[in-house]
Amino acid sequence: MDAVNAFNQELFSLMDMKPPISRAKMILITKAAIKAIKLYKHVVQIVEKFIKKCKPEYKVPGLYVIDSIVRQSRHQFGTDKDVFGPRFSKNITATFQYLYLCPSEDKSKIVRVLNLWQKNGVFKIEIIQPLLDMAAGTSNAAPVAENVTNNEGSPPPPVKISSELAQAPTNSMPTVAQLPSSDAFAAVAQLFQTTQGQQLQQILQTFQQPPQPQSPALDSAVMAQVQAITAQLKTAPTQPPEQKTAFDKKLLDRFDYDDEPEAVEDSKKEDAAAISTAALATAAPPAPTAATPAVATAVPVPSATSPPPPQTPFGYPGDGVQQPAYTQHQSMDQFQPRMMPIQQDTMHHQVPLPPNGQMPGFGLLSAPPPFPPMPQPGMPQPGMAQPGLAQPGMAQPTMPQPGMPQPGMPQPGMAQPGLAQPGMAQPGMPQPAMPQPAMPQPGMAQPGVSPAPPVQPTFQSTFQPQNEPHSQKPHQQEMEVEQPCVTEVKRHVPESRKSRSRSPKRRRSRSGSRSRRSRHRRSRSRSRDRRRHSPRSRSQERRDREKERERRQKGLPQIKSETASVCSTTLWVGQLDKRTTQQDVASLLEEFGPIESINMIPPRGCAYIVMVHRQDAYRALQKLSRGNYKVNQKSIKIAWALNKGIKADYKQYWDVELGVTYIPWDKVKAEELESFCEGGMLDSDTLNPDWKGIPKKPDNEVAQNGGAETSHTEPVSPIPKPVPVPVPPIPVPAPITVPPPQVPPHQPGPPVVGALQPPAFTPPLGMPPPGFGPGVPPPPPPPPFLRPGFNPMHLPPGFLPPGPPPPITPPVSIPPPHTPPISIPNLVSGARGNAESGDSAKMYGSAGPPAAPTSLPTPPVTQPVSLLGTQGVAPGPVIGLQAPSTGLLGARPGLIPLQRPPGMPPPHLQRFPMMPPRPMPPHMMHRGPPPGPGGFAMPPPHGMKGPFPPHGPFVRPGGMPGLGGPGPGPGASEDRDGRQQQPQQQPPPQQQQQQQQPQQQPPQQSPSQQPAPAQQQPPQFRNDSRQQFNSGRDQERFGRRSFGSRVENDRERYGSRNDDRDNSNRERREWGRRSPDRDRHRDLEERSRRSSGHRDRDRDSRDRESRREKEENRKEKHEVADRAGGNKAVEPPLSQVGTIDTVSELNKGEAMATVVKPEESPAEVTSPVGPEKDPGSAAEPPR
């Protein structure tokens, strides 16, 4: 039964699509049917049920389903073993009766399918021929009801109907009623087309009195004409709804595909009948008049003979009236063929045509005199569905058909013969007709409206018809079948129409129109109002659909009533190789968006990745679950994971397919909402309006998920938490070294500077804090920063070594409030998002601008240093490093800022910009602006990104220890530029110098090696403050210096700062080279520690001129002078690059340059890499 259920769902999903149905959809349905072939009887029954219950526009697609299933089965299993064909043939007659309820324009498609079946021998001719006859209307020449029910007779019936019509006049009332409907239609159409309009006018003038409804005895053509005219006038009001319906059907067919289908099909079928009737009617010109009168008579009969307005619609119950109408129809037959098309057209035109007083009465629909194609209506079944079928467009006639035996009905069906006739009598007739129609209208379907002037009814009807036609046609057909009981039919029609209108759920307006029809007695204004609401309802539906589409694009699941949706942003990635690293997973997912954290579980071969945004997680899941994606040559699986915020009590509500936890409102405590956001987010659309603070909680949730991206303010709060942690670790150790000198410079804004410095730490920490947050204040920091999750993993190795003193701790504690915001923004946006470099962050943030650049520059530098120092301190530093390591989504970018002293200040500046009140030291201000210029600010970030992210984690740690050098002497030496670190750590730079004599360019190394850079950086920092162009140079330092090639003469670079800038690219390359060399000599952990430390310390040294650095510079100055000649040449290009960068910055200020050189020389001696690089550097120094 699973296959049957699958087929059922596939088939009925057609209702969700708009015809025509695509070939791919038909293939899916056919495949589902073939799969369920064992239960082929169920499949056949489902298809038949679909055809029976679907809207008219889906009838033909249902036939195509039968055709596709049978042909595929015959092709796949052979004609002998095909089970579907014989099974469908058992009930095929009833099935085609429902199929012929389709829009009249689709009937040709049904005939085409039958012809193909006959040609290809799908079914026997004995089965197909009756179906073709049914389509032609031949099968039910006698029983109009059948035709109406089947809605099959549109093309062929015309001939038989015409003959029947000819006979009908003499025949009993019922036949007359049937024939008149189509004949009247044709007659009316003809009258409109030809001079009949004038004739009708004359007749109306002559016989303005309402025609005698039951004057079948009127044999004279004049009497017939008069009756036709009067009938038109009276029926126009009574039929307006019907005509409206027919016209509406046509309009809807063309424009409103949703509603029209049913009505259109019915109307078309009726039109076919009408066309056939029209053909017969052509015989007698007076007949049209008579037909009109028949309808009019019918109307008058209800109004005059009997007071039942409803009766008129169905009853034109003057059977006598029908007879006269029929007689008239005979006379009008000549006009009928022409009139049929005309009437249909007129129905369209009638809306505009006021002259057709009756037209207005009917439904303005016929107003447009589209003489064109209403003829088809006549063709359908004049006798059969005369009102409805006879007039394809005239679904409305079907309504009258019951009462009007179809004389009146046909007219409405025809194109509103009544209307058409008014059109015929357009000038004169309309007016007389108008008054008369007023009566017929009441008698007709619009008792209430009828009193209103015909014109008003016309407009009202126009509105109704459009809506009504769809519902009316099917109902009309039914009514025609029940013509004998006009009154009953009328009552039933509204309901049936309603039901049908309901079936086509496409249009609410349709349903409204149906309801209106049933309420014809009520005012049309009401129907109009309903119709007016329908567009609103449709627009509301459209808005709902658009909103749902937006929610799907955002990855949000469906909303359940009174249920809070906690959408997970956590993804589970499984089947990972045990060697898979966090970086591998991050590289897989970071393309989709920022990552908040990654939790690796190697024993299980899986990882839990918390994305910042639900949309990013949704896109990652959609893409990675479709293709065969591999990590380390091993295919992975991905799925939603329950977010951490969902406690065990709520796991029962977890939906793994949608990645959402649906928690009923009564189970949710408002205070728990915030906790739900961990690893997920609250769907604000599903929250109880009574919960207070929910908006904030969602924001927090966003902040937590989005971390830095979401909001800097929140990160700030988390950062303060991290700040306390960092304080113990004191990323400040490096800062401590540099802090004394920097403190004075920062002190210019002492309070702010003090706070800023701690913030500076915090920002640097902020960079780490993201990782840090997860470590120390996991909840707050992680949300603000993406790295937090990752940082813990990477930081430990690099950060443990540097254990700097907590001198900066106070600043950290002080700045936390301010710093967190600033640092967080940079970290989040800069580290992750920009990941490019501190420079970019600093330049963009120019954090300087928001905050006092003067204070900021120092804090940023201090912060980087503190971060590096923090590395030494396991708690904070580890996190800080991790922040870079969180490079998963930009950790390295975070490191990059640390690497470049100017870069670090900029990120801090950015953070400080968050804290505009803070004053920034002049140095920082200068740096900020230079990056701001953009030329350098932009490039450095990018350049830094490329080289730094990889180098940052490993290379910088070495440099970091160098700065931290005071603490870890050996670690410093091991730093990527170990030489410089060692010199600083080892006061006797002579030995180091001996080792790294070629590294006399160590001034440049100092940047790479934090100790020397720290010393040099003070001068550089001074240079920044002293030289206004430092901004550009700083940018170069950050962007180029790190990348600068150390191959060039360190001395030249050191001596010529321009050279240093030129060599910035080389240095960057050399940094990359150094990392490999160092990797060879040192452990990865040491590298990472040094690299992180290095960057931070370089910035710290540059930003802060520490007394130690000054002293070392003094000592090293002598050594540098001695070694300047030989050591520079010997100095390895890598170390030279780092030193050169610093030198160039230092050289910007001559005094600074001098100081830096001594520092560099000790660094050279200290770093063991120097000797390795000596050969290359030796060549350079001679330059």
UniProtKB/Swiss-Prot annotation:
Composition-biased stretches (Polar residues): 457-469, 1136-1145
PROSITE patterns assigned: CID, RRM
GO molecular function: RNA binding; RNA polymerase II C-terminal domain phosphoserine binding
Any Pfam family hit: RRM_1
N6-acetyllysine PTM sites in chain numbering: 49
Modified residues (Phosphoserine): 154, 717, 1042
Residue ranges, compositional bias (Basic and acidic residues): 488-498, 538-553, 1047-1122
Functional note: Anti-terminator protein required to prevent early mRNA termination during transcription. Together with SCAF8, acts by suppressing the use of early, alternative poly(A) sites, thereby preventing the accumulation of non-functional truncated proteins. Mechanistically, associates with the phosphorylated C-terminal heptapeptide repeat domain (CTD) of the largest RNA polymerase II subunit (POLR2A), and subsequently binds nascent RNA upstream of early polyadenylation sites to prevent premature mRNA transcript cleavage and polyadenylation.
Protein name: SR-related and CTD-associated factor 4
Naturally occurring in which organism (per UniProt): Mus musculus
